[in-house]
Every structure is written in C-alpha cells, then in structure tokens.
Amino acid sequence: MMKYSPFQDEPSSDNNNNGQNSESQPQSNAPKHPISVFFHLFFKIVAVAIFILSSFVNIGFVLTFIIVTLSSAFDFWVTKNVTGRKLVGLRWWNQIKEDGTNNWVFESVQDKSQVNPAESLMFWVPVLAFTAAWFVFSIISLFGLSFLWLVVEIVCFLLAGANLLGYIKCAKDARKKVKGMAQSYIVGTIVNQAINRV
C-alpha cells in the first residue's frame, strides 16, 4: 500500500526493507536520504572552499570564477529540485505568465511525520549559513574595492538567496495550508454537531 506523496515521481511505501510495518517502529533521527544530504552539502562546501583557497593559492581568477560559479549553480539545482523535496518535503518554482506576471507555485507534503527532524536541520542550517556567508564575502569585497571578486560573490549570493527565499515562502505556504485545514476541520465538526442536535 502506498502513502500519499504530493510529488508524483516519488511514492513512498508503508513497508521497510524487512517487510515490517514502519508505523510500529519509532522514527529514527538518522538520515533517511544520506546521498541527498551529501550532495546538499557537497556543492556548497566546494564553492566556498575553492573561493577561500584561491586567496591563499594562486589558482587564477578565471578558473576560480568557473569552478565557484558552476558549483553554486549545481548547488542551486540540487537544492531546489532534489534535496528540498527529499529532506524537508517542500518544492517551489516560479512561473512567468503570458502577461508577464510572476506566479510562485509551492508544494509540500501533507504528512509532516514523513519529514525527518535531523534532515530538516541539515537542510535549513546550510541554506541559511551559506547564503549569509556569500553576503558577508560580498560586503568584504565591496569595502575592499575588490570588484572582480564581488561579481563572483554576488552571483553565488543570488543563487543561494533565491533558494532561501523560495523555501521560506514555501514553508510559510505549507503552514498556512495546515492552519486552513485545521480550521475547516473544526468548523466542519461544529456544523455537523449543530446539525445532529437539530
């Protein structure tokens, strides 16, 4: 039997590998998606490490720019399309309509028990920390009048910041949906009780 998943390409089953029902076992804090966690951190760390390493080792601006920008672009794609839905059960995208207006689209799992708290923490902390790091690097380069490096830092900050903004909006939308479902359930229960008394 399949559990509900809002992500059509990712059904999850009720049974684990041993054939035992997963409901009878307590939820572990161990990551359920270690490969996703690895790649969620890998591209972020590579981009920042190469950027910092280029200050101490003469790698060259062009090579550093290419490696850091590509790592940040890969990180943007992996975070937006893979790790967000696997680690925190959220997915977002932005559609531009024919009239030129933007439309943010959000998806989230309805059953928050599917989200592992440890994985959620491993998702949010790096998203916030690396966005803040690129912002700090940008400020340092701005005041240090290092405008070539500022270009790299702004590109990386914008990529990281777009994911941060998208996931914050997505998380707010998910909370709003849960609140709306709870309110409609309560109202429905009260109305049914009132009708049954009449």
UniProtKB/Swiss-Prot annotation:
Q: Which GO terms describe its biological process?
A: protein secretion; vesicle-mediated transport
What's one Pfam family here?
DUF846
Disordered: annotated span: 1-29
Q: Which regions are flagged for Polar residues bias?
A: 13-29
Q: Where are the transmembrane segments?
A: 48-68, 132-152, 154-174
Q: Which Cys pairs does UniProt list as disulfide-bonded?
A: none
Q: Which InterPro entries match?
A: TVP23-like
Tree of life domain: Eukaryota
Where is the major localization of this protein? membrane
Q: Where in the cell is it found?
A: Membrane
By sequence similarity, the record places it as follows: Belongs to the TVP23 family.
The name under which this protein is listed is: Uncharacterized Golgi apparatus membrane protein-like protein 1
- Lineage of origin: Eukaryota, Amoebozoa, Evosea, Eumycetozoa, Dictyostelia
